[in-house]
Amino acid sequence: AYYNTVNKNNEKTQIFLNAYLQAEVIKGLKYKLNLGLRKDHTKSRTYTGTYDLGTYGKNDAPDLSEGSSDYESWVLENTLNYDKEFGKHNLAAMVGYSAQKDKSYGLNGSNADIPEFIETMTGNVKSMTASSSLNELALVSLFGRIMYSYDDRYLVSASIRRDGSSRFKKGHQFGSFPSVSIGWNISREKFFKPLENVFDQFKLRFSYGKLGNQQMDKYYPTISVVSDGMNYLQGNNIWFGQLPNVTAVSPADLTWESTETFNAGLDLSLLNGKLTLTADAYVKNTNDVLLPIPYAASTGISGLSIQNAGQVRNKGFELSVNWRSTIGDDFSYYIGANATTEKNEVTKITAGGNNMAISGYSAHGAGGRGINRFEEGHPMSYFNLIETDGIFRTQEEIDNYKNKDGKQIQPGAQPGDVRYKDWNGDGVIDENDQHDVGNPFPDFTFGLRLGGEWKGFDFGLFFDGMTGNKIYNYQRYCLESGKFNGNYSTKLANSWRPDNQNTDIPRFSKTDGADNGLAYTDRWLENGSYFRLKTLDIGYSLPKNLLKKIKLENVRIYTSMENLFTLSKYSGYSPDLGESGSVDIGASYSVFSRGIDQGRYPIPRTISFGIQVSL
């Protein structure tokens, strides 16, 4: 009913321009200029009519909000590339410079209680509001790379880039990010000849690289913001004031987040290319992690301050195996599989002291407590929740639920209420019982490819999945906790009652002594493992002898299907959440968004048909 009173209109115009110029300066030396331009214009308008929806809300007079925004950006890149072969030696080098600038401007206005049937910004001027915004961002880079190989046997490459960002203050704007790699193609060595009938390639790889990250919501995180409206009444006079630093400001020494990666790899090809294998082991150390951190409540400052919060280590192993062969003269096929396992851990906290734990996403109704945390010795963004242990079936169970000192743990509970685990053993269920109950990162991710071709027919399948990850189902919390006015899940019809005790849903009551609808418990945490048929392609290519008559090279008729099925215990729309900027923690930081399902748009199932023609 509410949405029937709302009329929303959005218009967006985008213009893109990409161009390049390339010239050979001297033999082997090429200059290239790349230019990219983009311009966006957006208009939005929302008109909300009158409504009376009882406890949900009431609007006695229409409201109107209008806005427009403009965004423009340009990217300029200059590069010089040099390639030279002399005998068994091959040398390639590149140097370049790039610059980028983004600028956005927004204007918004709104008015409440406007006259009905007059959809313009008129009416009560006291309720009118207007605001504007202007943001600019600049990034400059110098970079270079050199690669050398001898007889395709020994390979060496090195690169470095120097990036500068306007997000940081002077003295901290620039970061240097080098990398180096070496490779040894052992199968090219003379001593490997006895095995050359088995191995087509046997190569070892080692590399080190450093990458920088300056992505954050705020354009000017270290600059103080002056807030007006700091007014007070003294006698018959109103004093109008402004105050700096009312919102959170980052430290002046805020700088680049950097990730150092150490990698060792192996590439194998056997049996005339039928079997290939690639394996990589790696360690990634991320330093000066950019995270949003709240000020102490005593400061009176709201919002989150972006800080270089700590260090994170990722250790993992990746394996990819592929087999390609034929059966008879007409049927060819391939099978491929890949798998990754990784361990994630916060190794150091550098913001607020080594013992500090940084709270992340706070669900509505969580009382400001974080659902996930960034804490030393744990995976980043692990779920910090109170464990549940089923439902009390009888009063006797409640009376006997005591700690080691004989203290009754949930004295206010009734049969049908949730049993919470007293993790610290003090006989009280509170924030001290929150602890690590899982994290959003999978223990194991995998993929499987199958395909083949027979007399013009071809097919291909791709499966993917992951295991071991957890998802906080915020949608289910909203629909089943009883904390909200509005629609409830039909599952609540199966709530515990004296005549319906074989259920895992607690009794339904707006007031209860156990607080069955707590947000910061693992009642809303689910297994995010899944197995999915991601793509299925089927095609048929017309015979060549037929195509010659109509002077065509190739004609293929096909159907392509995506997301045909997903096997998962997760009750939401899709367990494949990835990362999102939609999680409301005051800033869009993917580290705290992963594994939080706030109503992510479900992945669509698509089936398409087509024809490919080559002349």
Functional labels for PLM-detected ranges:
Residues Q307-P442, M466-N469, N473-Q475:
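Gram-negative outer-membrane beta-barrel transporters
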Residues F462-D464:
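Transmembrane alpha-helix/helix-exit interface in multi-pass inner-membrane proteins
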Residues S165, M466-R556, S560-E562:
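Extracytoplasmic gating/loop element in the C-terminal half of outer-membrane beta-barrel translocons
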Residues Y2-K8, L21-E24, I398-R419, L492, ...:
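Residues embedded in well-ordered regular secondary structure
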